[in-house]
């Protein structure tokens, strides 16, 4: 299944902390970054390794290093930025690509307004990051864009997904794997995930209340 729910106890505990209605902006940011690190750990488990020799304190020693993987992290503005530092902690040499999409609150469809992508996407693994996979419209649009630019290895990391979004992403891009910290119950009538986290962008940036 292309959408993989990470059921590790630490992940489940931290998602529970995020759901608290009275969580502070500071705490929401911190836990979002922590979960992003854990999702990045899961999403890179199949990266190939090669042995190299390094000079250890005891002499030359063979060690494992990731082999030839060029990675670009692709936050979907604006909420995806809240996950970026957590992923960078795990992959500090990754390049950053940015995609700006906003959701039309009448149609629930994504509207593209910005992009700044690194070069040589055909040689890179792209990790799209966005806290919420609701209708999956923004995620599908971002995958479409990366494919048009030549990227062939595309993965996604989200905090919370709705079954509707899981189904839509799987139908549109069955080869794209997505790691999520939780698959929730459903979308409400205005396209919010239930129980969800509320507006993750507002909680990360401290806007609206």
Curated annotation (Swiss-Prot):
Binding-site positions, 5-phospho-alpha-D-ribose 1-diphosphate: 78, 103, 130-138, 199
InterPro entries: PRibTrfase_dom, PRTase-like, Upp_B, UPRTase/APRTase, Ura_phspho_trans
One Pfam family in the UniProt entry: UPRTase
Biological process per Gene Ontology, one example term: uracil salvage
Pathway terms, separated by semicolons: Pyrimidine metabolism; UMP biosynthesis via salvage pathway; UMP from uracil: step 1/1
Keyword Chloroplast: no
CDD domains assigned to the protein according to its UniProt record, in alphabetical order: PRTases_typeI
Co-factor(s): Mg(2+)
Cofactor note: Binds 1 Mg(2+) ion per subunit. The magnesium is bound as Mg-PRPP.
EC number: 2.4.2.9
Alphabetically ordered keywords of this record: Allosteric enzyme, Glycosyltransferase, GTP-binding, Magnesium, Nucleotide-binding, Transferase
Catalytic activity: UMP + diphosphate = 5-phospho-alpha-D-ribose 1-diphosphate + uracil
GO molecular function: GTP binding; magnesium ion binding; uracil phosphoribosyltransferase activity
Transmembrane spans: none
Activity modulation notes: Allosterically activated by GTP.
Binding locations of uracil: 193, 198-200
Keyword Manganese: no
NCBIfam families for the chain: PRK00129.1, upp
UniProt family annotation: Belongs to the UPRTase family.
Alphabetical list of PANTHER family matching this protein: ADENINE PHOSPHORIBOSYLTRANSFERASE (PTHR32315), URACIL PHOSPHORIBOSYLTRANSFERASE, CHLOROPLASTIC (PTHR32315:SF4)
HAMAP family the UniProt entry points to: Upp_B (MF_01218_B)
Its job: Catalyzes the conversion of uracil and 5-phospho-alpha-D-ribose 1-diphosphate (PRPP) to UMP and diphosphate.
UniProt-recorded name of the protein: Uracil phosphoribosyltransferase
Organism annotation: Methylibium petroleiphilum (strain ATCC BAA-1232 / LMG 22953 / PM1)
Organism classification: Bacteria, Pseudomonadati, Pseudomonadota, Betaproteobacteria, Burkholderiales
């Amino acid at each position: 299944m292309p959408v993989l729910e990470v059921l590790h106890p630490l992940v489940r505990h931290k998602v529970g902390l995020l759901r608290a209605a009275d969580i502070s902006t500071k705490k929401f940011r911190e836990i979002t970054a922590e979960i992003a690190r854990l999702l990045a750990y899961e999403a890179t488990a199949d990266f190939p390794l090669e042995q190299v020799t390094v000079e250890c304190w005891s002499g030359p020693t063979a060690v494992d290093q990731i082999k030839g993987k060029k990675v670009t992290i692709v936050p979907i503005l604006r909420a995806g930025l809240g996950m970026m530092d957590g992923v960078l902690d795990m992959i500090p040499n990754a390049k950053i690509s940015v995609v700006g999409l906003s959701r039309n609150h009448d149609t629930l469809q994504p509207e593209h307004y910005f992009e700044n992508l690194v070069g040589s996407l055909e040689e890179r693994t792209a990790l799209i990051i966005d806290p919420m996979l609701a209708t999956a419209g923004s995620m599908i649009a971002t995958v479409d864009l990366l494919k048009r630019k030549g990227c062939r290895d595309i993965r996604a990391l989200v905090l919370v997904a709705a079954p509707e979004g899981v189904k839509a992403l799987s139908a549109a891009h069955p080869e794209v794997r997505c790691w999520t910290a939780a698959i929730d119950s459903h979308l409400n009538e205005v396209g919010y995930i239930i129980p969800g986290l509320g507006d993750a962008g507002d909680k990360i940036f401290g806007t609206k209340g």
